């Protein structure tokens, strides 16, 4: 990543406010980095932008792996961008418990949406964080709001009933499930069903 001084950081801040996607990606990378200098730079950027956040509609989407979250997001995202909306997708991928790596492959499932000029797609590793999101998802949401995205979709890791943290940072929490999912005992347990605003049968 680029070595930043105050001038470069101020330039980055200005470009994020102008909605430049490359600069937004750099700002999110700074926020997600574990390097101390990057954390210091990120704090500087976020402090400068704290009064610039716009009120975007934030939608969280969860569901078991393979239920079709990415496909649903691309379909919804294309419809929104074609209606003139600016949307950001924050796709959280699981990190390996063995080596800490992450494939970050969700963007490849949104090929059509990734070509839209009004769309920003950012895959991020969860780095072992519980709750379906990463430790810096809140910061990424704030940066997307500053960049002028009207609708922010947060796609969780997709591992099941523990994915509740995203519901606390979004306005609408959607659960995608396949037909005939679960049994009677699962229905009694409820779990994530209790906090879902919308249940989508995909």
Regions inferred by a protein language model and the residue ranges of each:
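Hydrophobic positions on the alpha1 helix immediately C-terminal to the Walker A/P-loop
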Residues: 72
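Conserved SF2 helicase motif VI
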Residues: 187-189
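Switch/coupling subdomain of P-loop NTPase systems
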Residues: 1-2
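Conserved beta-strand/loop subsegment of P-loop NTPase cores
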Residues: 172-177, 192-202
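Nucleotide-state-sensitive switch-loop elements of NTP-binding domains
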Residues: 8-59, 67, 76-162, 167-184
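Residues at the beta-strand->loop junction immediately N-terminal to the Walker
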Residues: 62
């Amino acid at each position: 990543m680029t070595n930043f001084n105050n001038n470069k950081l101020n330039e980055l801040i200005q470009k994020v406010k102008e909605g430049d996607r490359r600069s937004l990606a750099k700002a999110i990378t700074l926020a997600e980095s574990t390097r101390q200098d990057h954390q210091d730079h990120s704090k500087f950027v976020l402090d400068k932008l704290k009064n610039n956040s716009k009120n975007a509609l934030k939608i969280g989407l969860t569901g078991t792996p393979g239920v079709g979250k990415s496909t649903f997001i691309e379909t919804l995202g294309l419809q929104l961008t074609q209606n003139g909306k600016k949307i950001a997708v924050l796709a959280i991928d699981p990190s390996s418990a063995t080596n800490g790596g992450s494939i970050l492959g969700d963007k490849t499932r949104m090929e059509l949406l990734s070509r839209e000029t009004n769309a920003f797609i950012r895959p991020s590793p969860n780095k072992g964080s519980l709750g379906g999101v990463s430790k810096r998802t809140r910061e990424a949401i704030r940066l997307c709001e500053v960049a002028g995205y009207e609708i922010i979709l947060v796609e969780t890791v997709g591992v099941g009933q523990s994915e509740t943290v995203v519901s606390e940072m979004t306005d609408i929490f959607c659960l995608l499930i396949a037909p005939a999912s679960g049994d009677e005992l699962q229905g009694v347990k409820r779990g994530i069903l209790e906090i879902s605003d919308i249940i989508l049968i995909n």
